[in-house]
Every structure is written in C-alpha cells, then in structure tokens.
C-alpha cells in the first residue's frame, strides 16, 4: 500500500517515522505563552531600546500574528485531506495545533508590549500572491499535491520569515528581550520540525513515483526564486532605517539564500545545493542563530538534538554565553 491508499486499522503503521519523528517529537515539545516571562522585556522596551529598534521589533511582531492561521489550515485541512494514513494525519493535526499556539503567543507579545500603534511588516502583496498560488493546490492529482507540499514545507515553513526570526533573536547577543528570544527559540524549533517532516513526505512521494521529482522541479525552482525575492524585499523593508547593532541586511540576504539552497537539497534536488550564489562569509555571520536556537549549521534542530525544551525554567543566562 502507498501513501494515498486508505488503511482502516490504526496500526501497524506503514510509515512509523511520521509518528516517532513527527507527532511524538512535536508532542514532547509542547509549550505555551504562559511559560514565558515578559517582565524584563517590558523593562528593556521602555528603557533600553531606541526608537529605530522599537519600530523594527514592533512591526515584525505585528506581522507574525497575521501569518500563522493560514499555516495551521494547510496542515489540518490540506495535508489531512490528501493523506489517509493515521500516522501522517495525526502528525499534521499536531503541527496545525502548534501553529495556533504560535498565533496566540505572538498576540500575547503584542499585547504585553502594547504594539497597537505600529504597522505590521508583511511580505510585498504582488510577490506574496505569486508564491501563494504555487501552494494553493486543492485537487487530487499527485503532481499538484507534491508541488504544493514541497513549496509549503521547504519555503513557507523552512525559509519564510527566518530573517525576521534572526532579527528578533539578535537582541539576545546584547542580553535584551529575553522573553521574545525564548519564544523565537521555541518557534524556530517547531518550524524546523514541520519543514523537515514535510520535506520527508515529499521525498517519500517521489520514492513511490519515480517521475515526480523531475515533474515538480521547474515549479519548485520558480517558488524558490519567488521566496528569495519575497525575503529580500522584506529585509529591505525591515532595515529601511538602516542596520541595527549585531545584524545587517546584507548578511541576512546571504543567510536566506544559503538556507534556500539547503532546503532544495532536502527536497531531493541534490544538484541544486549551490543554485543561489551567496557570500559564505556574510551568511556565516549568522551562524550564531543556529547556535542560540539549539541547532547547528546545515542541520535543522530535530535532526540532531533532544526535544525536552518545553519547561518554563529552561532559559539560558546569555551573560554567561556572551
């Protein structure tokens, strides 16, 4: 039986890794915004951040709160509807549920910092629509499903907004905004898991249909190019008032290109690992992002580390690190 063949019995699982590496790891990684103390963040916001930094952080956070619902719907409606296997469906439902936790948590940050006077940084509408069209497949054709799943998993979950995650997390380098930093750490780990397992699901589809990888290639490359354009414009928007201490727009652009290459390889296009030319030194200036969020360069977190990070007292003392 294949991925699209219904199995009435709950077990035995035919694809057990979607339970062990997907559902179980996400369940073990459960967290809530109520675990995050924001007292020091409020003090930092009122006393230590300048107006340019407040503009940047406030607009990023407002934008985040508007993006999570669509991601949740993709997992709980599209993926659950396409794949009848229990182990895949329950993983997708768990992922979708976790995205609602993100939405609530971002809203909590916005309310705590009183960000109602800021305008959300969002992806440029025309380019975003082109990308959304590549994800918005609703039919039952395996080629359409594969394209949509690949683009969503690799780029929507694995690249989109990572520049914003890095900007917010960069304040940890200065021992500021620890509550926001803790939430970014947990959010990045969740997104890394979602992207990793979605890419695996695409590869498994390709393993069962030898033509899929090649049939999807052109549209996936097109989506990668569109994502680079989206993130580049988004970075320009974030840094319209100039760079901030600890991070630069130029480094972020190369970081995103490198990450997009890595996701193309993770989908199975091993020959596209250098598709987008990037400055290795500039991209390497963001290696601290992988270190502080618990991952390692070239490898998403869940591939290499345990997942017991849901405890409220887990936070590091960044003065000790830096």
Residue ranges and their predicted role:
Residues 1-322:
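Non-heme di-metal
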